[in-house]
């Protein structure tokens, strides 16, 4: 196994320099070139701290050494990690099921945080037994985590080699758009985001939206399709763009409730009314959606249940009770309120 000396030798620096860079010592002045050489050496040598780590094997688990098990979770959020109601509902399900079985979450990270090499290095050095990943990671980060963490369960991920718990995003979008068409709308805008890997045209919620349009002989118009990258400010500005097109849509499908509520706010600020001028439907049925003005029509996603099932699968894997990956798809349902 690689040591800090090996890293220093490959990067052509001292072990003290390596240590300070790994610890993000801001008082230590070092060039970006040196910093990059050190991180490249860390990656090449697959170096982590605490190489002599406490082993937690299946026998230990069966002998009730639950306290030795370290479980982590990675959230796909662009804001502060504890402010996104969708992911917090999933996380509450994860934590409840872990606590019920005597476990707890030791590490919670966001995808954005893992872009920082120091945070990624520290996470890889945590000696995690299991990990729950919410949505798809980049190939590079995912491969590094897979190399260090034996048991990984995904929630709404595209990683095919691990267990996945999800809802059918395509079908959920179809339900939302079909509801708008049933209400008489023919010109329907789309506000969504991507995983940062695939373009919007490959995103399942967009494909579900487009499928219903095609089934109803409605032509796709990319002028009223906006990729907001799950960013609230961008969502607001993109909604304004939709409202300013010459042939303004009579309805908008937003791929999350938060984006739908931002769209409603933008519509009001343009002097228009919901749903009289423009109907809006979201997706996820977060708690606050019923209290928006007007209450938001949406697609209910079993968020807490997804978290509970993912945690239950992870516990089963840690205990060595099964090995082949499986995919569990949970049902969604239309919730009609006053925004449509």
Kindly give the residue locations of the regions a language model identified:
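Short acidic capping loops at alpha-helix termini that bridge into adjacent secondary structure
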Residues: 186-187, 220-223, 274-277
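Short acidic/polar active-site loop segments enriched in Thr and Asp
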Residues: 14, 48, 69, 129, ...
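N-terminal helix-turn-helix DNA-binding module of bacterial transcription factors
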Residues: 1-62
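Alpha-helical recognition/docking segments in bacterial nutrient-uptake
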Residues: 61-178, 182, 242-244
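Flexible loop/turn connectors
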Residues: 238-340
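Hinge/beta->alpha junction and helix N-cap segments in small-molecule ligand-binding domains
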Residues: 77-89, 107-115, 165-175, 191-238, ...
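Periplasmic-binding protein-like
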Residues: 125-134, 189-192, 225, 246-259, ...
């Amino acid at each position: 196994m690689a040591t800090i000396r090996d890293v220093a030798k490959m990067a052509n620096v001292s072990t003290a320099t390596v240590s300070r860079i790994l610890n993000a010592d801001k008082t230590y002045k070092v060039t970006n070139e040196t910093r990059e050489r050190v991180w490249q050496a860390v990656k090449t040598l697959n170096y982590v701290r605490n190489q002599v780590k406490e082993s937690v094997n299946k026998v230990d688990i069966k002998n009730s050494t639950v306290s030795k098990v370290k479980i982590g979770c990675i959230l796909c959020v662009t804001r502060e990690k504890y402010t996104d109601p969708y992911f917090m509902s999933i996380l509450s399900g994860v934590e409840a099921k872990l606590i019920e079985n005597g476990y707890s979450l030791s590490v919670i990270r966001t995808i954005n945080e893992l872009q920082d090499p120091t945070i990624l290095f520290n996470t890889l050095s945590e000696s995690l037994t299991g990990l729950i990943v919410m949505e798809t990671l980049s190939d590079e980060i995912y491969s590094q985590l897979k190399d260090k963490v034996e048991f990984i369960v995904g929630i709404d991920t595209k990683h095919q080699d691990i267990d996945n718990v999800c809802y059918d995003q395509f079908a959920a979008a179809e339900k939302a758009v079909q509801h708008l068409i049933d209400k008489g709308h023919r010109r329907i805008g789309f506000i969504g985001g991507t995983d940062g890997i695939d373009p919007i045209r490959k995103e399942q919620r967009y494909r579900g939206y487009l499928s219903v349009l095609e089934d109803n002989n409605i032509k796709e118009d990319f002028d009223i399709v906006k990729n907001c990258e799950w960013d609230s400010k961008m969502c607001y500005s993109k909604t304004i763009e939709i409202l300013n097109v010459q042939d303004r849509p009579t309805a908008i499908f937003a791929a999350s409730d938060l984006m739908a509520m931002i769209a409603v706010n933008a519509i009001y600020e343009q002097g228009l009314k919901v749903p009289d001028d423009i109907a809006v439907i979201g997706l996820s049925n977060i708690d606050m959606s019923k209290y928006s003005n007007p209450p938001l029509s949406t697609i209910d996603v079993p968020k807490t249940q997804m978290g509970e099932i993912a945690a239950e699968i992870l516990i089963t894997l840690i205990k060595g009770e099964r090995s082949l990956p499986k995919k569990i798809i949970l049902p969604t349902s239309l919730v009609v309120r006053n925004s449509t």
